[in-house]
From Swiss-Prot:
Cited SUPFAM superfamilies: Thioesterase/thiol ester dehydrase-isomerase
E.C. numbers: 4.2.1.59
Coiled coil (UniProt feature): none
Localization: Cytoplasm
Protein name: 3-hydroxyacyl-[acyl-carrier-protein] dehydratase FabZ
Free-text function comment from the UniProt entry: Involved in unsaturated fatty acids biosynthesis. Catalyzes the dehydration of short chain beta-hydroxyacyl-ACPs and long chain saturated and unsaturated beta-hydroxyacyl-ACPs.
Keyword list, A-Z: Cytoplasm, Lipid A biosynthesis, Lipid biosynthesis, Lipid metabolism, Lyase
Organism: Chlamydia felis (strain Fe/C-56) (Chlamydophila felis)
One annotated GO molecular function: (3R)-hydroxyacyl-[acyl-carrier-protein] dehydratase activity
InterPro entries xrefs: FabA_FabZ, FabZ, HotDog_dom_sf
Primary residence: cytoplasm
Length: 154
């Protein structure tokens, strides 16, 4: 595995189509193309737009956004695997199976996002993913992706 931080925000913007307020990965701590795994990080702050309504008196990061941050971390790895096709293809999050929410994520938490792909093909991929705050698992599940030509989205 490459040592941290191997990919910072500026390079992430070249690997993901997401932008503020929907970019939910701050940096990649490590990745291994041979093992098809990645570890990334999201620093959760009180300034996140979703905390305005979820919930003002007791802010908790919505579970669906924890899953989205996992999908984005996995998408970074797909972007690295695509390498030469990165500008032509896009990874789309298709779905999640076996999703479990185990621990609340609050302002000030550092969310560690890890994913390991069991399948990567020209059509997409499947990955096991886990989001943790410290040693506590916040959420986990099996993610599915499709790889599509960007031109087909026009």
């Amino acid at each position: 595995m490459k040592e941290a931080p191997v990919i910072k925000l500026r390079e992430l913007l070249n690997l993901l189509p997401h932008r503020y307020p929907f970019l939910l990965v701050d940096k990649v701590l490590s990745y291994d193309l041979e093992k098809r795994s990645i570890v990334a990080q999201k620093n959760v702050t009180i300034n996140e737009p979703f905390f305005v309504g979820h919930f003002p008196e007791a802010p908790i990061m919505p579970g669906v956004l924890i899953l989205e941050s996992l999908a984005q971390a996995a998408g970074v790895l797909l972007g690295l695997v695509l390498e030469n096709d990165r500008n032509k293809r896009l990874a789309l999050f298709l779905g999640i199976q076996k999703a479990k929410f185990r621990h609340a994520v609050r302002p000030g938490d550092i969310l560690t996002l890890s994913a390991e792909f069991s399948l990567i093909s020209s059509k997409g991929g499947k990955a096991s993913a886990r989001a943790c705050v410290g040693s506590q698992v916040a959420a986990e599940g099996e993610l599915s992706f499709a790889l599509v030509d960007k031109e087909s989205l026009d």
